[in-house]
Every structure is written in structure tokens, then in C-alpha cells.
Amino acid sequence: NYIHEWLFHKMAKELGIIGLNYKFIKVSINGTDRGLYALEEGFGKELIERSKRRNGPIFSFHEELSENAFGNWYQDNTNLEVYNKRYWNKKENYQILKSASNKLNNFFLGNEKLENAFDTEKWASYLAICDLLYTYHGTYAKSVRYYYNPIIGKFEPVSFDGHRGRNHPNFNKLNKDYNNQIILDYLYNHDDNFFPDTALGWLNLFFLNKDKKLNENFYKLYIEKLELVTSDNFLNTFLSSRKKEINQINSHIYSDYYLFDNLLTRGPGFYYFSKKDLEHRAKTIRTKIRTESNNYPEYIQAGIENNKLIIKNYLRHEHYASIIVKELICEFDNIYSLKKL
């Protein structure tokens, strides 16, 4: 995955998310040069402790499950797999494993609230990173890993499978197929040219409450994290502090015979790293989430509830910024029922 997955793990660590050690090495087998390989860390105790966490179980879904998650395939925790199974099945560790497994199972079955089961700040950061870097493969339910933090009793994401797919080429003014969508576009206004499957559908568990209404707390966190990772200060600092490493890695990739990902096939292709592409992506996201308009009267509602004037702001999903009410004029002596402004 060229340098994209390396950036993915580095940015995850930058935001306090558990990220894998990931580097590039030249491989020779029995004296035969095999070219450049990516070396990726596994999911052991060392990963957790290096990330300054208490040792806890890490879960994944069976890789062979359909990518059309979140669908009808989730029935119970038989779909879950824990790393270092022998260790966690020991008598002295089993209670932590059981508690964690039950909580994750109940969350996916809709019996546990997001805030009670997941560290929402870490997950909002993780989704924001995947939006910025186009690493949507890492947001699939079967791709991301779930670390149970026994201190807070909640799950954190472990960055994994941060693959930037073939339908996310570098920005170019002549490229009419440039993908400017973010996760909310997929969930509410998605274009099947860019998201032909339903693999991100499970993220509704983050953005919608059980009554299918917007989870405003998580939504606000997600927008805050998007603002952070797309800010000029964050992106420039992140890239400039790693400029030497980025140049070294790309020089090795450019000199290697790399294969291009065509989803179902692979073959020779063209790759180059573009800082301007990331800068354009960040600007595109900022524009989306800051969109303001005064032309949505049907989405603002006012009324009296418990002797208080209540202004309700209804989110219109093709725009992500809150609608700001700058002035309220009441032309009635009394408000007897809810009246739309």
C-alpha cells in the first residue's frame, strides 16, 4: 500500500490511538533479491504496553466474513476472535475476556450504548484519520481491531488495514472522478460509484442512537476531530516532522517494481506521493463541514416546552455545519404550539 498505510499508523499514534509499528525493508531470500516489503507488527502484549495501556484482550471479526458489514451476519460473539487466546483463556484472565466479549457482543446486538462500550474520542479520531487519508478499508468492521481497556471498561480502536483503494487517486484538476466524500456522505448521501458495497454501514451504530436519531455527542466529536486533522497547523506539523522519513521511503518505492491495486487484480501501475493531494483533501473536508446556509427553514423549529422557548436545529445531512440562528423574531402574542420558522 505504498506509503499510505505508514502515514495511517503514524497519524493514529499522533492522536493517541494504538498504532502498529510499520516499516519497509529490502528482502532477499536465499540470495535472491525479492524487492521492497512492508513489515507490520502483530497484536501482542508489547503493542499494548508500548502504547501505555494496561494489557487487555484485542478482538477481531473473522476475516472470511462478508465485507458487507454491518449486515445480518452478526448473530452472536461466535463471529469474534481474540488474539493470544491461550493467555486470555487462563483461569486468572478469563473474567476479563468474558466481560469484554459480552460487552462487545451486546454493543453489536444493540443492547449496549456506544458511550458505555466504546472510547468515543478515540473512535472519532480514528474515523477522522480514515476520512483524511482515504483509508476506508481500515473502518470495515472486520478490519479494525478492538482493544478492551480494562481500566475504563471500554473498547479502543487499533489501527489496521489502512488501505487506500484504487478509487481514491491523487487530486488533479483534470480528474473528473475525484472522490470528495467523507464517511457521512456514505451513510446518508453516498454515491455508489465510490462506495459500491455496504461495508461502512455498521458505522451507523456510532452516528445513530437506537431510536435511529442522530447521536449528537458522537457527531460533534467526529466533526471536532475532522477540524483538527484537516487544520493547516496539524497537517503541516505532521508532514514536516516526518519529511526525511517520507522522502526516504518514497525513494525506495519509486526504485522498486511496484504493483498497482486494481481491487480484484494487480499489475504494474503508477504511484507517486503528493503533499498537495493531502492539502487539497483537507481543504475539501473543511469546506464540507463548515458549510453554512440560511435556506433551510424547514430544519429549524421553535416552540414552548415546559414554559421555555426551545429552538431545535435539525441536521440536514448533505451539509455538516450546525445552522446558526442569529435572530429570532416572534410575530405572535402567544405561541400555542410548535411553529416552524
Q: Residue locations for each model-derived region?
A:
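Internal "kinase-insert"/substrate-recognition segments embedded within catalytic cores
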Residues: 15-20, 32-125
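Surface-exposed patches in mature extracellular/periplasmic domains of secreted proteins
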Residues: 17-26, 114-117, 144, 233-238
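Catalytic-loop signature of eukaryotic-like protein kinases
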Residues: 26, 135-147
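Carboxylate/His-rich catalytic cores and anion/metal-binding grooves
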Residues: 28-29, 50, 54, 145, ...
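Middle-to-C-terminal accessory/interaction subdomains
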Residues: 91-98, 102-135, 139, 153-318
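Short, hydrophobic/aromatic beta-strand segments
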Residues: 318-327
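Intrinsically disordered, low-complexity Pro/Gly/Ser/Thr-rich segments with frequent PxxP/GP/PP motifs
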Residues: 330-341
